Swiss-Prot record:
Belongs to the universal ribosomal protein uS2 family. Residues 265-292 are annotated as: Disordered. This is Small ribosomal subunit protein uS2. It is found in: Cytoplasm. Component of the small ribosomal subunit. Mature ribosomes consist of a small (40S) and a large (60S) subunit. The 40S subunit contains about 33 different proteins and 1 molecule of RNA (18S). The 60S subunit contains about 49 different proteins and 3 molecules of RNA (25S, 5.8S and 5S). Interacts with RPS21.
Length: 292
């Protein structure tokens, strides 16, 4: 079934195609496996094979319809040994309820029931058949269907549903997992169909993109430095205001002293002056009443 023959509700919108092109999901590699020739649109002058995005969307919807029929979401196992897909599979698992294996796949997880990591999923989804070959081989041993994002140089051996897309770019991997998760939720009826936003799914593709741990640490350090600088500025402002208050009090005290000094005071006695000496030889003045 081609993309133009899909039901109208399942057809790709202009925004979806723009997202696929912006994330370079249509750019393959210079090598092309024989099993992937049907998904190649043309070959550029520099040798890069261009993938037909119409067939990419067709296989994406087919995989979503298969996953939506599984009653227990925990029976789906998503795997990514490629670092660019670690965050994407974890987000897919958190939104859909699937089991996520991010990082190294433990050999025997599907075949050796003695191991603690033993699982019996009904279907698995892998990011790259070349990197996740161990999981695909073990799934083939126990008859577990495999859905894989396949680049032009990937082999489709033991792969039941191959979704042609660029599986080497961080943006391409994150966007493909985002679109697959969104279609599964739409087919389940969890998310209404509509544009991304309040009327539809309010999750953006950026949440599925890979983030460099050093970049995260750098952002955390910048935030901590900004917070420390803000605290220092606040402390300096508080110290400046306190110093201004002390200066104002000191100026007020000096002004009071100046006012008191300007007020008139009583003449003080000069204890250094000698008293005027009297004449002890002079006779006392006669009494006005007369003598005896």
């Amino acid at each position: 079934m081609s993309a133009d023959k899909l039901p109208k509700a399942l057809q790709a919108t202009e925004d979806d195609i723009q997202l696929l092109l912006a994330a370079q999901c249509h750019l393959g590699t210079k090598n092309c496996d024989k099993s992937m020739e049907n998904y190649v649109w043309k070959r550029r002058a520099d040798g890069i094979h261009v993938i037909n995005v119409g067939k990419t969307w067709e296989k994406l919807v087919l995989a979503a319809r298969v996953l939506a029929t599984i009653e227990n979401p925990n029976d789906v196992c998503v795997i990514s040994a490629r670092p660019y897909g670690h965050r994407a599979v974890l987000k897919y698992g958190s939104f859909t309820g699937a089991q996520a294996i991010a990082g190294r796949f433990t050999p025997g997880s599907f075949t050796n029931y003695i191991t603690r990591s033993f699982k019996e999923p009904r279907v698995i989804i892998v990011t790259d058949p070349r990197v996740d070959h161990q999981a695909i081989r073990e799934a083939a041993y126990v008859n577990i269907p495999v859905i894989a994002f396949c680049d032009t140089d990937a082999s489709t051996k033991f792969v039941d549903i191959a979704i042609p897309a660029n599986n080497k770019s961080r943006h391409s991997i994150g966007l493909m997992w985002y679109l697959l998760c969104r279609e599964v939720l739409r087919l389940r009826g969890t998310v209404p169909r509509g544009p991304t936003g309040p009327s539809g799914w309010d999750v953006l593709p950026d949440l599925f993109f890979y983030r460099d741990p050093e970049e995260i640490e750098r952002e955390a350090a910048e935030k901590a430095a900004a917070a420390a600088a803000q605290e220092g500025a606040d402390a300096e402002a508080a110290a400046t205001s306190a110093a201004a208050g002390v200066t104002a009090e000191y100026d007020a005290g000096n002004a009071a002293d100046a006012v008191l000094a300007a007020q008139p005071t009583e003449t003080a006695l000069d204890w250094s002056d000698e008293p005027v000496a009297g004449d002890w030889a002079a006779e006392p003045a006669a009494d006005a009443q007369g003598g005896w």
